[in-house]
Amino acid sequence: MTISGKDLAARLKARMAEQVATFPAKYGRVPHLVVILVGDDPGSQTYVKNKAKACDVVGIRNTTVRMPGDTPEQELLDKIAELNADDTVDGILVQLPLPKQISEPKVIEAISQSKDVDGFHPLNTAALWQKRPNSSCVVPCTPMGIIRLLEDANYEIAGKNAVVIGRSQIVGLPISKLLLDRNATVTICHSRTKNLPEIARQADILVVAIGRAKFVTGDMVKDGAAVIDVGMDIDENGKLCGDVDFASVEPKASVITPVPGGVGPMTICCLMENTIQCFLDKVAAR
């Protein structure tokens, strides 16, 4: 079964729009997300436009701050500090990747934890891994989108063997933790993993986030596996594809996400959820 992130995202955004529509009467305003775009990378510009469109659908106020590609690191940090201090701003997102003169870790850490809608701040990462009772932490958007997709497909995670190919702070590590929290047994693979195809074939749930076009083929997947493709690559014909060879894997999978239209729309959807969460956490703290 191919599960559409586009369809699920549309349903969830409609539900969020109903929620946000009640905010002016309750709180006097709607959430406000600020996205900072440094440079003119075409891919980043597309991502930022898609985020703005999603905000418009949900009813979230959104502002895009555009800075030239040669912006000094300190200038970007000063802008973040300004937005951190602005009480009308609920969420701050700096579009990655950044130009080489700017340290991504330094920028991520500069964003206030309470406005970190990406969930990348070290304190949010720590809260996710510590799983503190009653703690409110923002979960990275792509991993949360994957969980939403599996849950919407009524796929039982508990007791399953999950293999995650990729160990990034953005996807691989946090999705491993979310799967663990739902009682899966998780194996994390990476570029140095030996016998990777053999390990992948043991997976009931296979999450692929390695950044290599059509890396996972049908002979690496066992019958009935749930396959989640996080990749966004270009194939030999110049067409958009994922890290999974959909044509050979789809006949074997019980559940599979396409590229495009799978995980991508859910990433943006969960960004909207995180922005609303940051807004409501601020309101509750007053």
For each feature predicted by the language model, list its residue ranges.
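Short, well-structured alpha-helical segments in soluble
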Residues: 75-87
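Short beta-strand elements in bilobed, periplasmic/extracellular small-molecule ligand-binding domains
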Residues: 55-69, 186-188
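Short beta-strand segments enriched in small/hydrophobic residues
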Residues: 31-39
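Glycine-rich, N-terminal phosphate-binding loop of Rossmann-like dinucleotide-binding domains
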Residues: 96, 210, 230-231
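Glycine-rich phosphate/diphosphate-binding loop of Rossmann-like nucleotide-binding domains
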Residues: 38-52, 136-226, 235, 239-250
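Anion-binding alpha/beta catalytic cores of soluble intermediary-metabolism enzymes, centered on
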Residues: 93-157
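Positively charged, low-complexity intrinsically disordered leader regions
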Residues: 1-27
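Rossmann-fold NAD(P)-binding glycine/threonine-rich loop
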Residues: 105-112, 116, 125, 231-285
